[in-house]
């Protein structure tokens, strides 16, 4: 047990010296290579241990550490850092997660440093993504419909109307007027000088470089080494010995099972019409939709509190850090998911947040809120990440 604890300690204490030099991290190719080499070396040390002498706790620790180390090596082998883009997220839009209330002067100065680091971050990420495009690893063009909203909204005429300026609109009351004015002036300067030009570069990169070279094929298996990569994702997400075909067959079985349940419900509620009619009813009847963003948030908060009260019945240890229920920021809402959990570090005084997307209310049915809340807040990601 001592030996495996030593390896766990080595993994937890790994320091990326270059990453620590920038508030947004280092995205140079060497960083990913060095980390993969470190994990591969540690994995070999781990595999050399005599597991037959392990007790249950040691075996669990071994399995988990091996799983994490192996995934780090596999991700580098497939160069996943060359493709940090999804239909609802990207290297640039993830910056919005850093926009939080400023609680004191120290946090404000730290946030200003973060904003100043955005140009370097954008340049490094663009370089990596260009490598992915050249290697045929880009995302399919079809997923980028409406994607311009993820960068156009940050190209503002003034600093004050920029989303990244919003934390300075309400500064802590303990700051003096002079301190507040100084911080706001510094924020305006860095947004005009660094943030807005950086997002102009993002716009140019996507519209002049990425979109013209995006692939038309949708499936990742149609990319170079794509079938092997897809299998690696099956291995990671299921932790089972499955194949694409076996998962597809399970999916068909689930579709059949769920469809039967839906048909039973239609009969149970005495709905007059076909399944297509029932689905249309669920998607269009006003009774299932909030009329205002505030109504949707209120409903989500109500469900969250009902889930909170059930936690002690099922979990012995609960997190001390609370979570709030808040709307997805307008800057990213149009291309964002229905909800998301935004965590925070244990050292931070900030709470976690369960974000609810209040954009396009006709696409946000109230009956989806219970499962969304249980997944994103409790007993889902907040409970999981705060312990």
Spans of model-derived segments:
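N-terminal maturation segment of proteins
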Residues: 1-387
